[in-house]
């Protein structure tokens, strides 16, 4: 099995194991059967066994006798050997031609690297069957198990409701026509988040619905939970409607999302005309009126809110003088409050009971540095199911109804201190002491004072209860208001009071006007009234987990605008269709309409208002106007009037679309502009900070925020400078304000803040806004999902127990399309909070991305090209900064070492060397020894210990390398470059033998042995070129020689062979027996085979100096011989090639086919290759003696051949060199062309890369063995072509030895040594 494919390996192992197991089983059964049969045949076997043995022995003897003689000879001489004999050269005395034979061998190369197979793994372990179905919202949960979502049919676990942490805010479901969402399989590790059941969630397929609910396979529902506030989940039996796909887009978490989760669901269902059926919790009325269907719709928000308040809710059985049991019921969970809802009373909690509750809670606050708790105000749609059904709401509503005649409300009914706290603070909230805040710009920080934050949820039910009358009777200051009918109803709707003892004991809210007895207030369109909302806010807290301050608010009182209708608490069952009405009808802007647009939350800090409360008295709110008119009121800003009232206008932006009824979800970026984070660098310090959270579908400009944030930079404006507030009528009956400051508008468009120091100087600011215009029509109502938050944060607020009355007035008026504002209006400008960012993208971005996803690949590329063309350099630079890190991941370092090495093994060695220069980690991996060993194996590089390796470190020129195989490869690479392209160093010239011919040449290690016709042999050092020894003893010319280690054997015309000791130069043995010139020899181990002109071959033992065998059979002089230790192959002038068995002294095969003298041989144990004067080269089979191939192509005598791994290179007297494949008989390359030799090729050498050839033209050429291309000339004699000849060459990986001379005396006889090794290579020399 190939490595790198674990899947395939495991499968193969498994298959092999199965086959082995089956084989063992089969063999076992066979053995059992054979035992039974053997027991029955025992006696018969004993009788006939001896005869069978004799018969088998006889048959074996006959087979042995009948073996062929050739087979016996082969088996007798079956000892393989690799020839390392020297180059023997014999001058043919008869023909005067040189016979060239080469036997120098290079290491064999291994086969090609095995490829890595990749086997795909089929994961068939899953057995779940996914069945998709469209949910039927009209059926209960019991029927959803078989029709809704994806489920596993094999799962029999009981249904369970799991709570999953909703952290994947950035995921966007694919837009599809169906309501099916992608499967969500998320296991929540928080055990306390499991609401229903104690069993874990079954591992089944789940369907995510659009309202944040996941429908499991068994019919159970999984409700997502945000990480901010823990929420209670509805009953599993409830049916939850689904929304559109686009409404599920994630957005930044904020507190308003947590508190309005139920409102969002309810608004969605109201838009779809559906009703969420749930168990009624704390109904406001004992006998609520029936709706259209006779079924009361309730919101899930009641349950969700109770969990956030640690399940501390107000019970419905409070009386005017509550008992301690009633107090205990006030702290009971919501589930218990459902049973007590029938005993509600119209009186509020007594102060004594509230004080007793405060004593318990004060201990918690004192341990938290006397910080106040959160006060949560929930005002949802006036439809009854969206109300917080708490007893305090009804009791306060009843109290305010009783006071309609007098038009005043008692301030004692409005507790603002710890005595009036009715609920405990949520322990999950994070409280922060202002004295310890990291901002250093707080100038009036007081450690005694606590920071309180008020959260005002200005939903469409802000005026659900009838408008309460202002305590100061501000309505009497306006004549037009006296003639009009305003709204006064049950104030303090949906109130949760949670204050600190340092707050004011009473803050009474009042609103001008009187209410009708029916709980709703209507008036003619011609009458004009000024609407204002007074907020007495206390108890703020700052959330650490968001950039904006988390706030809660209390005591809202609303005054409806002209021509509006306010729905009271008694209209609990008023349906959405009833409240929508006709488009031309006038109704309150806070009434619930069928066009469920996003509602807004306005969060006001109590400390900010307390700062205003200490400096102001109730003013007279005046306003005049008529329907369709655009009046303009001039308002002056004063600092020295202690009786001035600060009127803060908050224009609640309507959702765009002209009342089309589109449902806007908080997660839909296309329908709203998300809120930005508070910037520390933008002076978010102890100065007042306004956090505006928009939810509009119209323009990207925060127009409704601009009226408060941008227009009034109150600390920098002149006290006497007038502020012009122009009121213009907009389309669809909406009212829009254009607030301009002609002299200082542009200079005040900066961070929204109120300088606390200026406020303490005694100056308050009065802003009176006169509003008029038709309110109503399609989409005129402020819906449930809009939210707007305003936070006023002050560090030091003087605490006082005196009654200060209402001081700050917030006028909330719906606004129309911001695009219709005038160019100079501040409403058309974007506030700093709406600047787009990564977490706050523009609304159109989501649509653009959705369209981009629908395009094909080519269309996307085109869109990107166009996008880049329209980008300026700064934007292109931003793209580069984002894209570049994606391509800079160090995947090699991240992988395990084994996998990283496996990846690197596919790189070429030169690429590995470059990769090693990347970093330390990559160098460590790229230097792996086994990795480079494989590279060396493929390149046929042997890393044996060599004495001529170059030095490393200080003395050498190569850096030290940890991996020996890498060092060997790098050294070989440098050597190859020296051969191929680098300048040839000046050769060493070894002069000797005078003017005689060098007839034989041997080279091994650092020693060179040359034989000449001057009867001598010389031993040279290949390192320094010195002549080490001169071997004298022959009486005739030396025409053949062999060399092995320290032994030199020479053959001469004196018919003897001599064995020499290289170190001492002494002749060890003289081998006599031949009767003519010893023309050729081949040494293998301790035996040497010699061929002579006497037509015989002799086998000698060089250690004993004796003749072992004499082989007789040739008819003419033996010209060439090869010996591998087992068989001897000889070629002679009788045109024949013989294969001998030396031990038996017999000829196994006579290879006949040549038609002329045989001059050269090559033998590798399997094949015999013979070159003849007949220009042919024949390939013979050793076993059969048959001729396998006849290689034709040369035109003359084949003077020399080299054979390595089925590759044969032959040099011919026709000046060409050919490369053959002896297995196929094809000519692979012909080394010729314009750079070919100009005369006969005398000798050649080759390895796996190069072919080196010498010629009578006096040149030595280098060729590429694979391509046959000419590389360059290594040697070019000056006398070349005029008599200079290169007779013999020998080469290894680093050196080339050339025997040079001439026939006419034009070139001196010498040896040239060319070194291609790495510079600095040091070899041991003697």
Swiss-Prot record:
- Can you supply one Gene Ontology CC term for this chain's record? SCF ubiquitin ligase complex
User: What, per the annotation, is the impact of changing residue 1117 to V?
Assistant: In ago-4; increased cell proliferation
Give the modified residues of type Phosphoserine. 825
Q: Which cell locations does it reside in?
A: Nucleus
Skewed-composition ranges (Acidic residues): 165-187
Output this protein's name.
F-box/WD repeat-containing protein 7
Where along the chain is composition biased (Low complexity)?
Answer: 320-348, 465-486, 510-520, 528-546, 616-631
Q: Where is the composition biased (Polar residues)?
A: 9-39, 403-464, 495-504, 632-642, 797-824
Knocked-out gene: effects: RNAi-mediated knockdown in the posterior compartment of the larval wing disk increases cell size in the posterior compartment of the adult wing, resulting in an increase in the size of the posterior compartment as well as an increase in the ratio between the posterior and anterior areas. Knockdown of the gene is embryonic lethal. Neuronal-specific knockdown results in deficits in habituation learning, as demonstrated by the light-off reflex habituation assay.
Q: Which GO terms describe its molecular function?
A: cyclin binding; ubiquitin-specific protease binding
Q: Which InterPro entries match?
A: F-box-like_dom_sf, F-box_dom, G-protein_beta_WD-40_rep, WD40/YVTN_repeat-like_dom_sf, WD40_repeat_CS, WD40_repeat_dom_sf, WD40_rpt
What job does this protein perform? Substrate recognition component of a SCF (SKP1-CUL1-F-box protein) E3 ubiquitin-protein ligase complex which mediates the ubiquitination and subsequent proteasomal degradation of target proteins. Probably recognizes and binds to phosphorylated target proteins. In the wing and eye, negatively regulates cell growth and proliferation by mediating the degradation of Myc and cyclin E, respectively. Required for endocycles, but not mitosis in follicle cell epithelium.
Give me the ranges of the annotated region Disordered.
Answer: 1-58, 123-187, 318-351, 399-549, 615-642, 797-843
Assembly and interaction partners: Part of a SCF E3 ubiquitin-protein ligase complex. Interacts with Myc and puf. Interacts with CycE.
Q: Identify the gene encoding this protein.
A: ago
> Spans of the WD repeats?
992-1030, 1033-1070, 1073-1110, 1113-1150, 1153-1190, 1193-1232, 1236-1273
Record domain F-box: where: 889-935
């Amino acid at each position: 099995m190939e490595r790198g494919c674990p899947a395939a390996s495991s499968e193969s192992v498994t298959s092999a194991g199965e086959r082995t197991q089956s084989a063992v089983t089969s063999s076992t059964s066979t053995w059992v059967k054979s035992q039974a049969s053997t027991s029955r045949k025992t006696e018969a076997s004993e009788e006939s066994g001896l005869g069978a043995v004799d018969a088998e022995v006889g048959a074996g003897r006959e087979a042995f006798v009948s073996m062929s003689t050739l087979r016996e000879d082969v088996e007798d001489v079956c000892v393989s050997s690799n020839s390392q004999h020297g180059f023997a050269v014999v001058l043919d005395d008869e023909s005067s031609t040189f016979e060239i034979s080469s036997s120098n061998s290079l290491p064999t190369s291994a086969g090609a690297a095995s490829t890595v197979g990749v086997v795909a793994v089929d994961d068939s372990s899953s057995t779940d069957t996914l069945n998709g179905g469209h949910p039927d919202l009209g059926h209960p949960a019991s029927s959803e198990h078989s029709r809704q979502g994806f489920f596993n049919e094999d799962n029999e676990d009981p249904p369970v409701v799991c709570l999953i942490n909703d952290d994947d805010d950035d995921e966007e479901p694919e837009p599809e026509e169906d309501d099916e969402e992608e499967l969500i399989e998320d296991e929540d590790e928080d055990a306390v988040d499991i609401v229903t059941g104690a069993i874990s969630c079954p591992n089944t397929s789940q369907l995510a619905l659009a309202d944040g609910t996941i429908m499991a396979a068994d019919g159970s529902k999984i409700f997502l939970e945000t990480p901010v506030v823990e929420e209670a989940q509805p009953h599993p039996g409830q049916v939850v409607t689904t929304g559109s796909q686009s409404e599920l887009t994630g957005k930044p978490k904020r507190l308003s999302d947590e508190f309005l989760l139920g409102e969002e669901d309810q608004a969605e269902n109201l838009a779809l005309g559906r009703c969420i059926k749930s168990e009624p919790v704390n109904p406001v009325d004992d006998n609520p009126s029936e709706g259209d269907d006779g079924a009361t719709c309730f919101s899930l928000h009641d349950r969700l809110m109770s969990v956030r308040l640690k399940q501390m809710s107000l019970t419905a059985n409070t009386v005017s003088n509550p008992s301690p049991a009633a107090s205990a019921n006030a702290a009971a969970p919501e589930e218990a409050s459902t049973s007590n809802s029938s005993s509600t009373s119209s009186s509020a909690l007594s102060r004594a009971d509230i004080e007793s509750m405060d004593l318990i809670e004060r201990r918690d606050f004192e341990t938290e540095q006397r910080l106040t708790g959160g006060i949560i105000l929930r005002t949802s749609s006036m439809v009854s199911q969206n109300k917080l059904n708490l007893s305090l709401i009804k009791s306060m509503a009843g109290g305010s109804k009783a006071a309609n005649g007098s038009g005043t409300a008692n301030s004692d009914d409005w507790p603002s201190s710890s005595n009036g706290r009715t609920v405990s603070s949520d322990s999950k909230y994070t409280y922060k002491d202002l004295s310890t805040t990291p901002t250093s710009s707080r100038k009036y920080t007081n450690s005694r004072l606590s920071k309180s934050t008020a959260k005002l949820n200005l939903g469409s039910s802000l005026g659900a209860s009838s408008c309460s009358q202002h305590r100061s009777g501000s309505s009497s200051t306006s004549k037009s208001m006296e003639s009009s009918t305003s709204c006064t109803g049950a104030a303090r709707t949906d109130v949760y009071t949670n204050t600190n003892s340092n707050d004011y004991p009473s803050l009474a809210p009042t609103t001008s006007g009187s209410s009708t007895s029916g709980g709703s207030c209507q008036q003619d369109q011609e009458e004009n009234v000024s609407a204002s909302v007074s907020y007495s806010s206390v108890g703020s807290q700052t959330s650490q987990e968001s950039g904006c301050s988390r706030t809660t608010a209390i005591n809202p009182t609303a005054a409806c605008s002209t021509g509006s209708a306010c729905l009271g608490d008694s209209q609990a069952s008023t349906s959405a269709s009833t409240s929508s009405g006709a488009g031309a009808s006038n109704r309150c802007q806070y009434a619930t309409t069928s066009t469920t647009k996003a509602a807004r939350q306005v969060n006001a800090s109590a400390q900010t208002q307390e700062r205003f409360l200490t400096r102001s008295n109730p003013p007279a709110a005046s306003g005049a106007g008529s329907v369709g008119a655009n009046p303009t009121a001039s308002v002056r800003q004063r600092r020295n009037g202690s009786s001035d009232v600060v009127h803060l206008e908050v224009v609640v932006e309507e959702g765009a679309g002209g009342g089309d009824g589109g449902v806007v979800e908080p997660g839909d970026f296309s329908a709203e502009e998300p809120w930005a984070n508070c910037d520390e660098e933008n002076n978010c310090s102890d100065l007042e900070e306004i956090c505006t959270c928009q939810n509009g579908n119209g323009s990207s400009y925060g127009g409704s925020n601009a009226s408060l944030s941008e227009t009034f930079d109150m600390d920098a404006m002149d006290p006497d400078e007038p502020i012009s507030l122009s009121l213009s009528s907009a389309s669809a009956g909406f009212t829009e304000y254009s607030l301009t400051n002609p002299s200082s508008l542009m200079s005040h468009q900066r961070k929204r803040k109120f300088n606390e120091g200026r406020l303490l100087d005694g100056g308050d600011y009065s802003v009176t806004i006169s509003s008029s215009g038709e309110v109503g029509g399609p989409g005129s109502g402020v819906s449930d999902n809009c939210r707007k938050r305003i936070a006023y944060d002050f560090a030091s607020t003087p605490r006082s127990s005196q009654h200060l009355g209402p001081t700050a007035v917030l006028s909330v008026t719906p606004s129309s399309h911001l695009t219709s504002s005038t160019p100079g209006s501040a409403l058309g400008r974007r506030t700093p909070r709406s600047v787009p960012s990564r977490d706050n993208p523009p609304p159109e971005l989501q649509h653009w991305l959705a369209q981009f996803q629908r395009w094909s690949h080519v269309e996307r590329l085109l869109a990107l090209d166009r996008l880049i063309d329209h980008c300026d350099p700064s934007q292109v630079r931003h793209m580069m900064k984002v894209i570049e890190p994606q391509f800079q991941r160090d995947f090699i370092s991240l992988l395990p070492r084994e996998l990283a090495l496996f990846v690197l093994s596919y790189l070429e060695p030169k690429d590995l060397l470059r990769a090693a220069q990347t970093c330390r980690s990559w160098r460590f991996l790229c230097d792996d020894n086994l990795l480079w060993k494989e590279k060396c194996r493929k390149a046929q590089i042997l890393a044996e210990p060599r004495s001529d390796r170059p030095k490393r470190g200080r003395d050498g020129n190569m850096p030290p390398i940890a991996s020996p195989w890498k060092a060997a490869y790098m050294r070989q690479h440098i050597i190859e470059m020296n051969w191929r392209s680098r300048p040839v160093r000046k050769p060493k010239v070894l002069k000797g033998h005078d003017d005689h011919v060098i007839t034989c040449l041997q080279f091994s290690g650092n020693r060179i042995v040359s034989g000449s016709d001057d009867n001598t042999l010389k031993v040279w050092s290949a390192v320094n070129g010195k002549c080490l020894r001169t071997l004298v003893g022959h009486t005739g010319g030396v025409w053949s020689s062999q060399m092995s280690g320290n032994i030199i054997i020479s053959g001469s015309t004196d018919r003897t062979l001599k064995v020499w000791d290289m170190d001492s130069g002494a002749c060890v043995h003289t081998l006599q027996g031949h009767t003519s010139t010893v023309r050729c020899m081949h040494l293998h181990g301790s035996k040497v085979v010699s061929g002579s002109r006497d037509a015989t071959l002799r086998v000698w033992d060089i250690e004993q100096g004796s003749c072992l065998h004499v082989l007789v059979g040739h008819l003419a002089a033996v010209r060439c011989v090869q010996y591998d230790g087992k068989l001897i192959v000889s070629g002679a002038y009788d045109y024949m090639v013989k294969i001998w068995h030396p031990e038996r002294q017999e000829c196994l095969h006579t290879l006949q086919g040549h038609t002329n003298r045989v001059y050269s041989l090559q033998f590798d144990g399997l094949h015999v290759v013979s070159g003849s004067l007949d220009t042919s080269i024949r390939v013979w089979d050793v076993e059969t003696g048959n001729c396998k191939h006849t290689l034709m192509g040369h035109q003359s005598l084949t003077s020399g051949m080299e054979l390595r791994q089925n590759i044969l290179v032959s040099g011919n007297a026709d000046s060409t060199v050919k490369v053959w494949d002896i297995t196929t008989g094809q000519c692979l390359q012909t080394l010729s062309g314009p750079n070919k030799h100009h005369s006969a090729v005398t000798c050649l050498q080759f390895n796996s890369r190069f072919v080196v050839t010498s010629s009578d033209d006096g040149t030595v050429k280098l060729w590429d063995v694979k391509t046959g291309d000419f590389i360059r000339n290594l040697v070019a004699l000056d006398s070349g072509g005029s008599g200079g000849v290169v007779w013999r060459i020998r080469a290894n990986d680093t050196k080339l030895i050339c025997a040079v001379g001439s026939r006419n005396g034009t070139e001196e006889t010498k040896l040239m040594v060319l070194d291609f090794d790495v510079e600095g290579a040091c070899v041991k020399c003697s």
